[in-house]
Design a protein with these regions (language model features):
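Major-groove recognition helix of helix-turn-helix-like DNA-binding domains
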Residues: 72-90
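A short, well-structured juxtamembrane/interface segment
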Residues: 103-110, 171
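Extended, structured, electrostatic nucleic-acid-contact surfaces
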Residues: 64-73
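Extracellular beta-strand-rich solenoid/capping regions of secreted or surface-exposed proteins
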Residues: 136-140
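Short helix-terminating capping/connector loops at secondary-structure junctions
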Residues: 75, 112-113
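Short Lys/Arg-enriched helix C-cap and helix-to-coil transition segments
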Residues: 93-105
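Single, function-defining residue in the core of a domain
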Residues: 1-58, 62, 88-90, 97-98, ...
Length: 385
């Protein structure tokens, strides 16, 4: 009978060990390390995120119960203090750089719904206890961090992530996050609507779509009434008043009626070629990033941290993103028709099971569990027990 690795071990085969070792060597990550190497820490953190463990005790206990199944991963008995020290001492840049390396090597052949690549940019704030995470203090009684994120709108995969203090403004965070490419479309909410910021995108021959702020002073150059569509007006405008110098070029303003809310929405863009309804539809795509934030918070538990150190928090976040990438890689290679949550659920329930991962993901799960009818003797024994 052929030897079969556990599901967790098969997931870890997606990790390029040689590439990971290069990152470890760069930052001397395993220097004077005897108990928990950088790779073993990644293994433990992947287990943590997949099992949604939120305490050191829960992780150590869970791994201890499965130790016989994980011996081939070179995981020995781990103490809480060992795991806590590792999160403080291993350099978080190892996991950050490996995330981008893994991202580059993923096969992401994707049909683009709108032709152009859609990049969605936003941030999410993760609140923390100010007494425990004083390095993340940003208000009198609050602490927290922000994840400034750019995702691919068609795959919902994060391509750039910057972790900052929660007090950092979204535009300052995105300037560290985003690399603009000619012809691609960048979608923002109104929090990023700033003349100077948008003009930097224009100068790099990329496109943006955002919402018009109500206090912006603009002047209509030409106006077109659109009939027979949900888009009401398609106007060419320019920035008026003292701010004109911050964005001297013409802009396009699409006025759209949103039936579900009954609201009139105004979309601002520098793309003059796409149909007005397509502009509105692309902006609707912005919800993909909200779904991504919800997914990683709900399923990979990045709202509860095992370490109070800044380094430990970053390690946990980057390991959760690596786990998210691996789940997407498995989906794209093995079971494109299966929902990402279904893949996650099956893998988490069988992490220590020695079964082929493809068999696990393609096996038909019965809706009902057959129950054997007990014999008369069994019923009598139960009655008199």
């Amino acid at each position: 009978m052929a030897y079969q690795r556990t599901i967790l071990a098969q997931m870890l085969k997606e990790i390029n060990r040689h590439d990971f070792k290069i990152k470890v060597s760069k930052y001397a990550g395993d220097h004077k390390t005897h108990k928990l190497s950088c790779f073993n820490l990644l293994t433990v953190m992947m287990y943590t995120h997949l099992k949604s463990s939120i305490t050191l005790r829960g992780i150590v206990t869970g791994l201890g119960l499965m130790l016989s199944s994980f011996y081939h991963l070179n995981l020995k008995s781990i103490k809480r203090s060992t795991l806590s020290d590792a999160l403080k001492q291993r350099d978080s840049r190892i996991y950050e750089e490996y995330y981008y390396s893994l991202l580059r090597n993923m096969n992401r052949t994707q049909r683009r719904k709108f032709g152009n690549k859609i990049n969605i940019i936003d941030s999410t704030t993760i609140s923390m206890c100010v007494e425990k995470f004083n390095w993340a203090h940003y208000k009198t009684t609050k602490a927290g961090i922000k994840l400034h994120t750019q995702i691919d709108g068609d795959t919902r995969i994060p391509e750039h992530v910057t972790i900052t203090n929660a007090k950092v403004h979204d535009i300052n965070g995105v300037n560290k996050t985003t690399q603009y490419r000619k012809g691609e479309i960048y979608v923002y909410d109104r929090g990023y609507a700033c003349y100077k910021f948008l003009y930097t995108i224009e100068l790099q021959e990329a496109f943006f779509i955002t919402r018009l702020k109500s206090n912006w002073k603009t002047r209509v150059l030409t106006s077109h009434v659109l009939e027979g569509t949900k888009a009401l007006f398609d106007d060419i405008i320019e920035v008026d008043g003292l701010k004109h110098g911050e964005y001297p070029n013409p802009l396009r303003l699409v006025t759209f009626y949103h039936e579900e809310s009954g609201k009139i929405l105004k979309f601002l863009t520098n793309n003059f070629e796409m149909p007005a309804e397509t502009i509105a539809e692309i902006y609707k795509y912005r919800w993909q990033i909200e779904l991504f934030f919800k997914w990683i918070k709900q399923h990979l538990k990045i709202v509860s941290f095992l370490s109070t150190s800044k380094n430990g928090v970053k390690i946990q976040i980057w390991c959760s993103l690596i786990t998210y990438l691996l789940l997407n890689s498995i989906k794209s290679r093995l079971v494109k028709t299966l929902d990402l949550f279904d893949i996650y659920r099956r893998l988490t329930l069988a992490l220590d099971k020695k079964i082929d991962i493809l068999e696990l993901l393609t096996h038909k799960i019965e809706a009902t569990i057959p129950i054997q009818k007990p014999s008369d003797i069994g019923q009598m024994e139960l009655f008199y027990a």
